[in-house]
Amino acid sequence: MATGGLAKWVGAVQAFGHPSWSYVIKLRHGHVTMIERGFYELCGGENWNMLHELPGDNGLLEMWESRESMLESWSPGDGHSWAMAWAGWRAARETMQRRQYVNEPTFSCWSQSELGENGWHVHIIIGGPGLTRQNAAISRSILCTSFFKHLLITIRQRTHAPYTVLSRDELNAWNWLQKIAQRVMRGDMDDIVDILKCRKANGTLVAQAINGTEFITRYMLPKNRKVANTVLTRHTTPEQSYDSTWGKTYGFAVCNGETVSEFTRKDLWKVLYNIYTAHPAENMLNSNPSVWGDLPRVSANRIDADDAEARSRPIKLSRKQKIMAEVIQRATDGLLLTYNDLVVHLSDLMLMLEGMPGGSKTAEQLLTMIHIKLCAKYNAYEFMLMKTPATQNMNPGAPHYDCQGNLVFKLLNLQGYNPWQVGHWLVMMLSKKTGKRNSTLFYGPASTGKTNLAKAICHAVGLYGCVNHNNKQFPFNDAPNKMILWWEECIMTTDYVEAAKCVLGGTHVRVDVKHKDSRELPQIPVLLSSNHDVYTVVGGNATFGVHAAPLKERITQMNFMKQLPNTFGEITPGMISNWLSHCAHIHQEHLSLEGFAIKWDVQSVGNSFPLQTLCPGHSQNWTFSENGVCWHCGGFIQPTPESDTDSDGDPDPDGAVAGDSDTSANSESTVSFSSNDSGLGSVTSSAPSVPDRAEEIEEIPSECLEWMREEVDRLSAHDINSLAHQATGFILDPIPEEPEERERDLAREDAEPEASTSHTPATKRARVEEGEPWDGTQPITEGDWIDFESRQKRRRLEREEKGGEDEDMEVQESDPSAWGEKLGIVEKPGEEPIVLYCFETLPESDEEGDSDKENKTHTV
């Protein structure tokens, strides 16, 4: 039973040393109700069942007297609450002995055990000489170690008594305490013991000195008693010390080596409260409590939020920290991505920062912070629109698109790709919407525009990194905190192929960084440009093809096979921004893999990107770029023949050229292309645009024929194959004739050889021979390309030889005198001409006597 009068306790609390320090030792457990009985009995408690039999608010008023008598004769504070409070006081005494270097230290101590939601804890308030701000925080380890030492000593004294057998609950509690004590002995006690702290102006936390008397009065005393989770506070708190307005609870309290009486606790609080916390204004308000009767009720959440807001204080930054925060803010607003940008645009702040200790290292850290902040906020396409805004306005209602000299359209048309389709795919890839196909490869020989296009895209984005495959240990050293990755002249080796597959597929992976820990690399779009076979992995002197299939599933390949002229020019970031922004605007409803397949009528996007399919009347020739670009196929719209002028005459209002009577007279064979229908073009004529006979080509003006021949000679086999379906008379061959008609034409040519040379023969249409790989794809590897060129050269030689033999036959048939030279008969001077007799079979109806009339003589 607790002892001591009220006056003694008032004097003990008032005599508390100043300054004082408040410590908390925590014994955490996730399930308190499962272990509290074993912990109670392990510490010597013997009345667990009696605690649950104490009467409470059950209406049995006649039992109140028996409850008070029971509390007088037995204190329910025995067991773990009692053991923890006394262990706290003994630990405080041992700590002050070491600080004052005496066996009987002079100090004041209040030790109080309490039960919380996640376990038990002990408040220890210590005041006295030897404990200062410098060593108060360090003393936590001494106090915690001593506390568990005395707690375990108390338990061992009870368990080592004769005839003591531990129950299962007690064994569980003992194992739990042993684990906590072992952590303390190892020094791992950061979440076990703590001291009340405050934050200084520079942001550091230091031990906070308190007034022990006021702290005990305001915080430690106004609490009801609770020793177990399953027992109400009303059961274990005496009537004179119980207050229903107190929401806090305690278990047991010790002050200066004596037990604080639970019967005089409320009286002690009243006396100390009137001395240290009472205010004249409070007395005035307490005299008229009805003033607060009509106030609205405020929820506990609102009160907690207000308290948290009141406790929050603005963090005071140092001068260096303010400069760093200003640099990050300005660099983020101005999109400054490199150290050079910071020096040029924030020279004053960088000068101040470099003048401080460690300024260069701080600048690198600031750049990393800026990159992390931008990458977390934008993707590559969104950031490109901010870094390199579009400078060209687009009119979707126009019949055609005005590219205004954008070299991207010239390059992609030359290489056989639709600029709108390629731009649609790149916008999706930069927006991270292409799934596993997270990378695009520009493949082909040198000087075909691969690097030109990849470099312009990366510079338009701005925040890009490069892959250095020469450094085989850290190839992706520059990849973290970037929006797009550029791999120039990509080569795959066994050293980094596995990491490369993760990066190319957009998988989150950690990559090694030189002189630093590994960094996480989230999904980042990758652009590759190479003239090597990136699907063949090289390891030492061996090559492996097992990685080809996984790599092709991650890479979308575009083949650039036509070399560019030296005067092609450089693609600028502004061209890329205009092109991609217009592509995104046109296809804004199809920016997904499903939308891409529906828009371009493809089953799926494989490793080989689809080639361009031109609309009728549209060309890949940059000469026609001034007429605009088709909204659908991306080709250049050709001019109409009516707009062409002859060098010898001026155009008339009807579209015929003055001075060319043949063209103006025959209007049935006129072919014209209109620029309406959103730039798709249409063929309009009064008669079929394809002539019915080969000789009808003579009606087309000679200037048009020359231009057609030049265009046919310039076009490659692949270009003509892709244009074979177009219904234009200057590209297609004449319609095949019937055998009878063809024989009559040949007979007419034999009879009148001079007529065959009066007009220019129709140009032959280049054809793609059977077996050539131009079936919608292009040569992939360098070996395929060499085989293709050798087959082309062999077939060209065969056609030339065949064409030479045909010409010789024509010459021989047109000049009969060549027969004599072929037979070796040469006319010599002074000799008579040699007469050759040629005999022919006579019809059966002729008479034999007239056979000599059928002989023909030819003089050589």
Curated annotation (Swiss-Prot):
Keywords: ATP-binding, Covalent protein-DNA linkage, DNA replication, DNA-binding, Endonuclease, Helicase, Host nucleus, Hydrolase, Magnesium, Metal-binding, Multifunctional enzyme, Nuclease, Nucleotide-binding, Transcription, Transcription regulation, Viral DNA replication. The keyword Protein biosynthesis does not apply. The endonuclease active site can probably bind other divalent cations. Its cofactor is Mg(2+). Residues 643-653, 803-813 have a biased composition (Acidic residues). GO terms for biological process: DNA replication; viral DNA genome replication. It catalyses: ATP + H2O = ADP + phosphate + H(+). Residues 629-858 are annotated as: Transactivation. Residues 418-573 form the SF3 helicase domain. Residues 641-696, 728-860 are annotated as: Disordered. Residues 201-205 are annotated as: Ori-binding. Residues 1-145 form the PV NS1-Nuc domain. Pfam families: HBoV_NS1-like_N, Parvo_NS1. GO terms for cellular component: host cell nucleus. A motif (RCR-3) lies at residues 85-89. Residues 741-750 have a biased composition (Basic and acidic residues). ATP binds at residues 444-451. Residues 663-688 have a biased composition (Polar residues). The keyword Secreted does not apply. InterPro entries: BoV_NS1-like_N (IPR054766), Helicase_SF3_DNA-vir (IPR014015), P-loop_NTPase (IPR027417), Parvovirus_NS1_helicase (IPR001257), PV_NS1-NUC (IPR049901). The active site is at residue 219. In the N-terminus, the endonuclease region is involved in binding to the origin of replication. In the middle, there are the ATPase and helicase activities. The C-terminus probably contains a transactivation domain. Multifunctional protein which displays endonuclease and helicase activities required for initiating and directing viral DNA replication. Also plays a role in viral packaging and transactivation of several promoters. Binds site-specifically to 2-3 approximate tandem copies within the origins of replication (Ori), unwinds this hairpin region and nicks one DNA strand thereby initiating the rolling circle replication (RCR). Becomes covalently attached to the 5' end of the nick and provides a 3'OH for priming DNA synthesis. Belongs to the parvoviruses initiator protein NS1 family. Homooligomer; when bound to DNA. This is Initiator protein NS1. It comes from Bovine parvovirus 1. The lineage of its organism: Viruses, Monodnaviria, Shotokuvirae, Cossaviricota, Quintoviricetes.
